[in-house]
């Protein structure tokens, strides 16, 4: 099935934003564990290790801030979905590590991503 052109363009920008975010976070010393973890509850863009902490990362891209910046789109509903998906992932592990939820924004006007550690909590 072929995707509509607008959806293809939007999806490719999202993929590029995730690659840029991943590269930036690896430069900051984080190690990739999983990318695009899916389950019935939702998706987590990046799961990484920062020293001894497991980090669940939401990547946001916005071309402009007409409807709020990239972080404005991570509302309470989206946060609950990410937390529920993270709990599903944690059930696959033998031991539950320290965890945090980060957000990283890729803005078309900025060369450096904006990274918020502990962006939200359960």
Swiss-Prot record:
This is UPF0102 protein Ping_1176. Transmembrane segments: none annotated. GO terms for molecular function: nucleic acid binding. HAMAP family: UPF0102 (MF_00048). It comes from the Bacteria. Belongs to the UPF0102 family. Pfam families: UPF0102. Signal peptide: none annotated. InterPro entries: Restrct_endonuc-II-like (IPR011335), tRNA_endonuc-like_dom_sf (IPR011856), UPF0102_YraN-like (IPR003509).
């Amino acid at each position: 099935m072929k995707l509509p052109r607008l959806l293809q363009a939007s999806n490719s920008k999202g993929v590029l934003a995730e690659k840029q975010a991943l590269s930036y976070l690896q430069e900051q010393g984080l190690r990739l564990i999983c990318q695009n973890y899916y389950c019935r509850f939702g998706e987590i863009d990046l799961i990484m290790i920062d020293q001894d902490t497991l980090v669940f990362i939401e990547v946001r891209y916005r071309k402009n801030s007409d409807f709020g910046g990239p972080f404005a789109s991570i509302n309470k509903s989206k946060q609950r979905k990410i937390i529920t998906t993270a709990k599903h992932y944690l059930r696959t592990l033998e031991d539950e590590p320290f965890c945090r939820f980060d957000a990283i924004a890729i803005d078309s006007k900025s060369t450096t991503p904006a990274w918020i550690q502990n962006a939200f909590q359960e």
